[in-house]
A protein has these predicted regions:
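Bacterial N-terminal signal peptides
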Residues: 6-15
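Positively charged n-region of N-terminal signal peptides that target proteins for export
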Residues: 1-4
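Pepsin/retropepsin-fold aspartyl endopeptidases
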Residues: 19-421
């Protein structure tokens, strides 16, 4: 747990990067590879921006290929001298001219406007609560490049079309020409669907209709209510009620994925998602399903690549059963507790955990100021292990002992099923 947190902190502090195809004294590289932090299954890299006085500032960038909109924090917009205008709900500014990733300039001018979340003054540096990033790199920018996300190696590569050598099984995909969003031809139970490829999402989603159909057809499939672990995306009010299920097998383009954890996509969000995709879709596959792969995006040829990088699957749902909301001030509010076998998985009540409490620390490690990925690393481990949660309620702090549970148990493999028969 501490090793994971320390590794992320090291990445943020050192900002090491290396460029390809650019020996000293020569022109700007045509492709670069830089270290990436995989935090709550999201890809975060270091980049530099030039401020008005000519100096440069290092910023953390969220690689967000499932979103066409450019977003940044108000602090960054102000630092760059951009004019910010606000409504009652959000702010915006002209897009920055460019960012520099590992020595390679990535122009952002193709996106006319950058969205800025409406935050209090003391949260001006917050792009999204629970993340340490101040700007994203959206699909509308990425679509002009070759892109490679190496999850096992914690690396990110970007280059001009034709400069990255992709490996692994490949398949043709549909790309929205207006915004770069990707739909991958897929099959579930021999029926064809489109599923988006969204490496900016920590968890995967299925349409309400398809989710219900699979749940009815497979009543013994592992399922639960409550967005714990990687399903705890942003701490939305409805996350304690989200339905989760493991799907036995998904053919995703050229590869087959087993025991895929998926969330039921609320109907209103699904309608917006499908409209933005510009074509029929049954949901999306997030990074949680692809952490063992090096995922290559060849936008110029409408092709994706999946090279296996490791075989071990990390138990992303062996966690303390809390549903959390990261706040703009760095604190974490408890939205709810997931049940296990019909009982609360964390002690409830006056001496336990209640909705609205704040998670102060886990085993003495402060939660405030951490990312979602760091906090869930604290809350994860081996089922049965005990964690000491420091809880705050009404200005009073007290400890609650909670055990790590094995949520959403994986389906048995085919050999086990045959033995049972």
């Amino acid at each position: 747990m501490r090793t994971c947190i320390a590794a992320f902190a090291w990445f943020l502090l050192c900002g090491v990067s290396w460029a390809q195809d650019s020996p000293k004294g020569q022109s700007e590289p045509t492709s670069v590879t830089v270290p990436a932090a995989i935090d709550h299954n999201r890809v975060v890299i270091n980049a530099e921006v030039q401020v008005p006085d000519g100096s440069t500032e290092r910023v953390h960038v969220w690689v967000d290929n499932g979103n066409p909109e450019l977003s940044m924090s108000r602090r960054l917009a102000t630092l760059l001298g951009l004019a910010v205008s606000c409504t009652d709900h959000e702010c915006s500014s002209p897009s920055p001219r460019e960012i520099n990733v590992g020595g390679m300039k990535i122009p952002l001018g193709g996106v006319k406007e950058a969205k800025i979340p409406l935050k209090p003054v003391n949260a001006a540096s917050v792009l999204a609560a629970g993340m340490d990033a101040e700007i994203n790199l959206p699909s509308s920018i990425l679509r002009h490049y070759d892109v490679l996300v190496d999850f096992p190696g914690h690396r990110f590569s970007i280059g001009a079309p034709g400069t990255i050598r992709f490996r692994g099984p490949s398949g043709k995909v549909q790309i929205n020409p207006e915004n770069g969003l990707i739909q991958v031809p897929s099959q579930i139970e021999k029926k064809k669907y489109n599923l988006a490829l969204d490496l900016g999402a920590s968890i995967s989603f299925l349409s309400e209709e398809l989710f219900a159909k699979l749940a009815t057809a497979h009543p013994d499939s592992p399922r639960m209510t409550g967005a714990v672990g990687s399903a705890n995306m942003w701490g939305l009010d409805e996350e304690p009620k989200w339905k989760l299920m493991r799907v036995d097998r998904v053919q995703y383009g050229p590869i087959f994925l087993a025991n895929v954890a998926l969330v039921e996509f609320p109907k209103d969000r699904m309608e917006f998602f499908e409209k933005r995709a510009g074509m029929p879709t049954a949901g999306l596959l997030g990074s949680n399903a692809l952490l063992n792969y090096r995922v290559g995006l060849d936008y110029a040829h409408s092709t994706v690549y999946f090279e296996i990088g490791r075989m071990f699957n990390f138990p992303d749902f062996d966690v303390i059963g809390l549903i959390l909301r990261p706040e703009d001030d760095g604190r974490f509010t408890i939205l709810g507790v997931a049940e296990l076998e019909g009982m609360p998985s964390v002690p409830p009540g006056p001496d336990g955990v209640q909705t609205g409490d704040h998670l102060v620390a886990v085993d003495g490690i402060p939660a405030a100021g951490s990312t979602m990925g760091q906090v869930w690393a604290m809350l994860g481990g081996t089922p049965g292990q005990e964690r000491r949660l420091m809880i705050e309620r009404g200005g009073r702090q007290f400890a609650v002992a909670a055990r790590i549970q094995h949520f959403l148990a994986e389906l048995p493999d085919e050999r086990d099923r045959q033995k049972k028969k």
